[in-house]
Each structure stands twice: as C-alpha cells, then as structure tokens.
C-alpha cells in the first residue's frame, strides 16, 4: 500500500488508475503491479457487482411462474374472503404472464391480452388484490385514480402519466415497466352521463375512456425521461404497453339496479317466475351476474368494455370477515400494532369483544376494511402518546368499552407495582 503522504518510496505522488484522484484526495490507495485503486472505486465496484447479483436473482425468480393455485394461496395470506375473485384473478394473471414468457409468434395462434375489471364496494380488497399480485410476481406496480384523468390538452393528468408513474417505480427501466401491472381505480366515476354517444365534449368521462382505449389495448407511448421539462433536449422514452396488465376497478354503485332491470325484463310473460321481495338476492349475488351489456348501460363505452374481458366481482365484507382481517393476514393491523408496542417493551392485547366492536364500527361507517385502521388509530392514539414516557408498563389491554369510548385502556405495570397495589388492597 502507498504511504500516508501520498508518495511512493521515490517521493512520486500516486494516483488512482481508475478515477485519477491522488492519494491525498482519498482515504486509501491500494497498490497492484503498476496500478493503483482508491477506496471510493472499490466501493463503486462492490455496488456494481451487488446490483448485478440482485438483478440475476430477480431474473431467476421471474423464470418460475407460480401456478394459479400458488397465486391463490399467496392471496389467501393477505386478503380475507373473495374466493371467486381470487380464482378469476389467479387464472387471468397466470395466463397473461404465460403468454409473455411463451412469446408465441405463430400465424395460426396469437394469444390476446386479457385485462381485468374488478367490481366491488369500497374497502372490499380490490387494490390489495392487485398489489399483492404484483409483489408475488416481482413486477413493477402503480395505482392511478381515474377521476384525476382528462383528455390530452385539458387541465388534469394525461393517461400517459400512468406509464410515467410505472417507470418511476422501476427507475426508468423500460423493459421492466413493459411487463408491469397498472391498477386504475374509480373507473366507474368516468362513465358517460347517458348510454347514448355524447355529442358534446366530456373531457373527464367518455373522453378519458377513449384516451385509455389504446393504452390498455397496446400502444407505444412517448414518455418524457427523468427530469421532464427541465431537460427538454433529452429524447422521449418509447414504452410499449401491449404486454402490460391493466386491472381496472370501481364500486359501480347502482349497477345492481341495471342488472336487476335486465333480469326482470327477461321474466315477463305467462312462463315468468313470480318472485316476492323476500326472495331478492344479496347484492354480491346480483353483481356476480353482470354482463357486458350492463356495463354499457351503466356508462362504459362498448369499446372499453371489450378491452377488459375478464370480470371479477367482490362481495361486501361481513362483520366476521372484518374480524378475520384484523387478525389473520400476515400483515394484519393487530399484528402491526402489537409489533409497534413490542418495540417499547409493552405487550398489547385486544380482547375478542374489542375486535367485534371495531368490526361493528367499521360496518356502521360503511367503509369496509379501509376504515379499520382509522378506528384503531383513534382508539390507540392517547396510549401511544403516553406509554413511551411511562416506566414499568408491561401490558396494555383493550376491550369493547375502550372501542365505544366508555373507558380507557387498561395499563398493567411490572410485578413491583402490582405487589404494591396488592399490599394496599390487603
């Protein structure tokens, strides 16, 4: 190794053979046969090797495509219920990526792309299903809100912004982005105002559907590179969307009425089955019978409906399902809060009646699983504020009365405190 003064035995100043810095500008300079390398270049080489190893591992993971049953089992770890939707999604996603990996280019058989439409109430798990799927397959994933989109040239986000967000998620690696998953939420909010073609400009409804058509079907989008307007001289990135999987979702409030009207119209005449109001189907059962014509009647244009041939319906979560969501998934909310308290050395216990009270409250708010975290945050806020400053607290117990606001959480102190209390009681 060169000496600390930055000179060799002959007094000559030494330089890194890679970056050109002299020894006075770096911490270490390692000598080889007629060459030198500094500690900064060593770190850089390590980073390059580490990235290549990670990429090779990721490519190795991509080579093995999990079977539909494996995909379904992974979804079960994170999403409670929605069995039919999981099955539909597992098969659709498996076939999509099988199509990409097979790369069939035959004159006889061309495998088309099957994008997915998720229909279900707020908080039923639409976004979580798509997100979990992307994580399992190790592909880039982004979420877009259809209500913020407008036609190009109008105030709002262009549909190309969706692809830019996906590129950002994978550090502008175009090849990775082209195999990613895009979830567009609130798609029902861009339905046209009537089922007749619009003669006036509808920039946030039918216009957005038209703009999304090519993107979903497959087109080459020109996306500004990193920096965007700051570096206008840079060439635009060309991103092919034909291999991206698009999942669109929405609550579609009122769709059940459209379906019911169609079914009832089909049951008119002497042979019609007479149904009483008592025999009305549950909302989930009605939505499960959705047909493309119902979606067109609701306000989606026929061309858009044709681009999302796979339809999966999700049911509204019951109180029992919400209790399961609180405790059973791998990253359940209760497990998260238990871990947070454990980091303070405190055990957190939720009684069974407390879990039921939380689920009941979420049902009353009609927010599905999405409302569970806000309820727990509200209940635990003061405790999370106080506990880090309190000594000797070993356990916090939450029961139903805490959830309803009738009492405070029970704090249990260490054995010394408990013995003092026992002595006083004695």
From Swiss-Prot:
Zn(2+) binds at residues 16, 19, 38, 41. PROSITE patterns: CLPX_ZB. ATP binds at residues 121-128. GO terms for molecular function: ATP binding; ATP hydrolysis activity; ATP-dependent protein folding chaperone; protein dimerization activity; unfolded protein binding; zinc ion binding. GO terms for biological process: cell division; proteolysis involved in protein catabolic process. InterPro entries: AAA+_ATPase (IPR003593), ATP-dep_Clp_protease_ClpX (IPR050052), ATPase_AAA_core (IPR003959), Clp_ATPase_C (IPR019489), Clp_protease_ATP-bd_su_ClpX (IPR004487), ClpX_bact (IPR046425), P-loop_NTPase (IPR027417), Znf_CppX_C4 (IPR010603). It comes from the Bacteria. SMART domains: AAA (SM00382), ClpB_D2-small (SM01086), zf-C4_ClpX (SM00994). Residues 4-57 form the ClpX-type ZB domain. CDD domains: RecA-like_ClpX (cd19497). Keywords: ATP-binding, Chaperone, Metal-binding, Nucleotide-binding, Zinc. NCBIfam families: clpX, PRK05342.1. Belongs to the ClpX chaperone family. ATP-dependent specificity component of the Clp protease. It directs the protease to specific substrates. Can perform chaperone functions in the absence of ClpP. This is ATP-dependent Clp protease ATP-binding subunit ClpX. It comes from Chromohalobacter salexigens (strain ATCC BAA-138 / DSM 3043 / CIP 106854 / NCIMB 13768 / 1H11). The gene is clpX.
């Amino acid at each position: 190794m060169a000496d600390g003064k930055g000179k060799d035995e002959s007094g000559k100043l030494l330089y890194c053979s890679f970056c050109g810095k002299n020894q006075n500008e770096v911490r270490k300079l390692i000598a080889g046969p007629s060459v030198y390398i500094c500690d900064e270049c060593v770190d850089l080489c390590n980073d390059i090797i580490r990235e290549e190893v990670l990429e090779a591992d990721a490519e190795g993971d991509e080579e093995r495509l999990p079977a539909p049953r494996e995909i379904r089992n992974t979804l079960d770890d994170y999403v409670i219920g929605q069995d039919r939707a999981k099955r539909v999604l597992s098969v659709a996603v498996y076939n999509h990526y099988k199509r990409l990996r097979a790369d069939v280019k035959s004159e006889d058989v061309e495998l088309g792309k099957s994008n997915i439409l998720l229909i279900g109430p707020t908080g039923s798990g639409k976004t979580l299903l798509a997100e979990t799927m992307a994580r399992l397959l190790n592909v880039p994933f982004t979420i877009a809100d259809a209500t913020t989109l407008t036609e190009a040239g109008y105030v709002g986000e262009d549909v190309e912004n969706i692809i830019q967000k996906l590129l950002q998620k994978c550090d502008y690696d175009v090849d990775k982005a082209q195999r990613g998953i895009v979830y567009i939420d609130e798609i029902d909010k861009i339905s046209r105002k009537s089922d007749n073609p619009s003669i006036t400009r509808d920039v946030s409804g039918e216009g957005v559907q038209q703009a999304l058509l090519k993107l979903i079907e497959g087109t080459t989008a020109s996306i500004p590179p990193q920096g965007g307007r700051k570096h206008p001289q840079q060439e635009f990135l060309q991103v092919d969307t034909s291999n991206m999987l698009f999942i669109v979702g929405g609550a579609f409030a009122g769709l059940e009425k459209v379906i019911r009207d169609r079914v009832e119209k089909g049951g008119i005449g002497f042979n019609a089955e007479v149904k009483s109001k008592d025999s009305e189907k549950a909302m989930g059962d009605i939505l499960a019978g959705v047909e493309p014509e119902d979606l067109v009647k609701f306000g989606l244009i026929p061309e858009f409906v044709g681009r999302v041939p796979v339809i999966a319906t999700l049911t509204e979560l019951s109180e029992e399902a919400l209790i399961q969501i609180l405790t059973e998934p791998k990253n359940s909310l209760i497990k998260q809060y238990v871990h947070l308290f454990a980091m303070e050395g405190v055990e957190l216990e939720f009684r069974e009646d407390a879990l039921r009270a939380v689920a009941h409250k979420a049902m009353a708010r009609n927010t599905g699983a999405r409302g569970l975290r806000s309820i727990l945050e509200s209940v635990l806020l003061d405790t999370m504020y106080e506990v880090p400053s309190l000594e000797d607290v070993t356990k916090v117990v939450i029961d139903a009365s805490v959830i309803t606001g009738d009492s405070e959480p029970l704090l249990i102190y260490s054995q010394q405190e408990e013995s003092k209390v026992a002595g006083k009681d004695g």
